[in-house]
C-alpha cells in the first residue's frame, strides 16, 4: 500500500515485549522499568491476526523486536503462525543474542528466515559495562550458531558511540572480512535513556566510513536482503559486507517502507512520531477485520514525510525504544 508520500509500505516491525534481560545504558535505566502486564499486551494469536490483516494491505515482511523478543514465551509458535500467512515472504528477528543459541533450531524450523544481532563491543569488560549484565560469550555463540544454520544474511548492528567503542570499529570490520557477516554501523540516537545521550557522542556515518577507508577498499553494492535503511559496501577480500545507517546526519525517510506495532497494540507510522492507533482496544471491542483494516489504512496515510529527531524529539517523546520496538 502506498502512503500519501508515494512510499510502498510493505514491512511491519512488531515489538513482542518491552522487557529485556539486559540494561544497555543508552536504552534502559539500571533499575529497569515498570513493565507491561501480561494482560495489557497483545496475545500471540492477536499478533498473528493483525499480521494477516496487514498482509491484505501489502505487508510482506515482518520483523520481531523488543525489548528483547526472546524473553517472551512461545516465540517459535508465533513465527509458525506468521509463516502460514500466504502473503508474508520474510520473517526476521532482532535480538541481543544472549538467549538465541538455545532456541535457534526451533526458531528456524518454525519459519524464521533472518536474524540481526545488536552488539556494541567485542571486549568483554566493555560489553559488560554497556549492557550492565551481559555475557559476551553467549552472543558470540549465537552469531556462529546462526551462521551454522544458514540464516543468511546474518547481520550485526553496532551503535557507534564516540569515546566508548569507536576504537573497535576496525575489529567489527574484521568480523565482516573473516566471516559472511553483514556488519552495520549505526549512528548514536536519542531514543532511550537520555541521561546517557550526548550529541558529541554521535559519530556521523560518513566519518565512520572515511575512517574505515583509510585501511580498506569499499565498493558500493546493492542493498542486502531486508529492505533496511543501510547503505552497503563490499569489502575487498572479505566474506561479508559493511553497512552504514545514518538517522541523525542523513535521514533515509524518503525510502522508509515500514510501520510499527507495539507490544500493547499501538500502531505507528514512524518510530519518531508520537501518534499511535490503538489496535488492542479495537480487538477487545470485537472489531471486524475490515474495521481493523481501516485503522491500518489511517496509520499508513498518517505516516509523516520524515522524522524530526534533530529538533529535540528525544526530550519530548516519553516512549523509549524498548517500548516502541527497536
From Swiss-Prot:
Keywords: 4Fe-4S, GTP-binding, Iron, Iron-sulfur, Lyase, Metal-binding, Molybdenum cofactor biosynthesis, Nucleotide-binding, S-adenosyl-L-methionine. S-adenosyl-L-methionine binds at residues 26, 67, 118, 189. It comes from the Bacteria. It catalyses: GTP + AH2 + S-adenosyl-L-methionine = (8S)-3',8-cyclo-7,8-dihydroguanosine 5'-triphosphate + 5'-deoxyadenosine + L-methionine + A + H(+). Binds 2 [4Fe-4S] clusters. Binds 1 [4Fe-4S] cluster coordinated with 3 cysteines and an exchangeable S-adenosyl-L-methionine and 1 [4Fe-4S] cluster coordinated with 3 cysteines and the GTP-derived substrate. Its cofactor is [4Fe-4S] cluster. SUPFAM superfamilies: Radical SAM enzymes. Its EC number is 4.1.99.22. [4Fe-4S] cluster 2 binds at residues 253, 256, 270. Residues 4-227 form the Radical SAM core domain. The keyword Iron-sulfur applies. It is an enzyme of class 4 (lyase). Pathway: Cofactor biosynthesis; molybdopterin biosynthesis. Disulfide bonds: none annotated. GTP binds at residues 13, 63, 94, 155, 258-260. GO terms for molecular function: 4 iron, 4 sulfur cluster binding; cyclic pyranopterin monophosphate synthase activity; GTP 3',8'-cyclase activity; GTP binding; metal ion binding; S-adenosyl-L-methionine binding. GO terms for biological process: Mo-molybdopterin cofactor biosynthetic process. [4Fe-4S] cluster 1 binds at residues 20, 24, 27. Belongs to the radical SAM superfamily. MoaA family. Monomer and homodimer. Catalyzes the cyclization of GTP to (8S)-3',8-cyclo-7,8-dihydroguanosine 5'-triphosphate. This is GTP 3',8-cyclase. It comes from Syntrophomonas wolfei subsp. wolfei (strain DSM 2245B / Goettingen). The lineage of its organism: Bacteria, Bacillati, Bacillota, Clostridia, Eubacteriales.
